[in-house]
From Swiss-Prot:
Broadest EC class assigned to this enzyme: transferase
Binding-site residues for a purine D-ribonucleoside, renumbered to this chain: 5, 180-182, 204-205
Role according to the record: Catalyzes the reversible phosphorolytic breakdown of the N-glycosidic bond in the beta-(deoxy)ribonucleoside molecules, with the formation of the corresponding free purine bases and pentose-1-phosphate.
Name of the protein this chain belongs to: Purine nucleoside phosphorylase DeoD-type
Length: 238
């Protein structure tokens, strides 16, 4: 069924979907990792593809920037296309000294400054956590490949351009490994919809060290994260 934001037909998506924020990253994954990949949606230049990875049917669909955008696509994929498992593959910032650019972080749970979860959870705090078994699959996938990962909590923010030293100090004190703009919202919606979800991000910005990844690398130099995620999706199907 065509939705206001996705023009794929029923059955065009696998029940397992990788979701980067960047449409160009979705295209990169489809071209470089999936066999016989076809474009199944392109409304508003939000690209989605379905193909085969090691014989298994996998889809990749971009979700845009921020909680509101990402929740639109997650909701429609689950409600209209019967998606059961989603891995968000993105980039994130950090304020943790031992974390560096290009390091990979698997997110266990995410706090947020967004009002979205409170609006949906009757003004109460919602515990936004990943699916345990999908986290375990990501961990085992990385371990099998010998790829170093970090596992910990995220802070999801509505504001990309903001200077708040007190907040950064708090994130350090609570050992918040990653800062992004989507995970807390995606985790809460996945809980409501009853699907498996996890978020894995490559560090693109170190806020304290004032170091950042180039825009080219943000599109295409995330191969370890992509490989871990694809392997995790098929781990129990082998």
């Amino acid at each position: 069924m065509v939705t206001p934001h996705i023009n794929a037909k029923k059955g065009d998506f696998s029940d397992c979907v990788l979701m980067p924020g960047d449409p160009l990253r979705a295209r990169y994954i489809a071209k470089n990792y999936l066999k016989n990949a076809i474009e199944v949606t392109n409304i508003r230049s939000m690209l989605g593809y379905t193909g085969r990875y090691k014989g298994h049917r996998i889809s990749v669909m971009s979700h845009g920037i921020g909680i509101p955008s990402s929740l639109i696509y997650v909701k429609e994929l689950v409600s209209e296309y019967n998606v059961k498992k989603i891995i968000r593959i993105g980039t994130c910032g950090t304020v943790i000294e031992h974390i560096n650019i290009n390091d990979i972080i698997i997110c266990l749970g995410a706090s947020t400054d967004s009002k979205v979860n409170r609006l949906r959870f009757h003004d109460n705090d919602f515990s936004s956590v990943a699916d345990f078994y999908l986290i375990l699959d990501l961990f085992n996938s990385a371990n099998n490949a010998g790829i170093k990962i970090n596992i910990g909590n995220f802070f999801t923010t509505d504001l990309f351009y903001v200077k708040n030293d007190k907040l950064l100090d708090t994130l350090q004190r609570y050992n918040i490994l990653g800062i992004d703009m989507e995970t807390a919202g995606i985790y809460s919606l996945a809980s409501e919809l009853g699907i498996q979800v996890a978020s894995i991000c490559t560090v693109s910005d170190h806020i304290l060290k004032k170091d950042q990844m180039s825009y080219i690398d943000r599109e295409s130099n995330l191969n370890n994260m992509i490989y871990i995620s694809l392997e995790a999706l098929i781990l129990k199907k082998v």
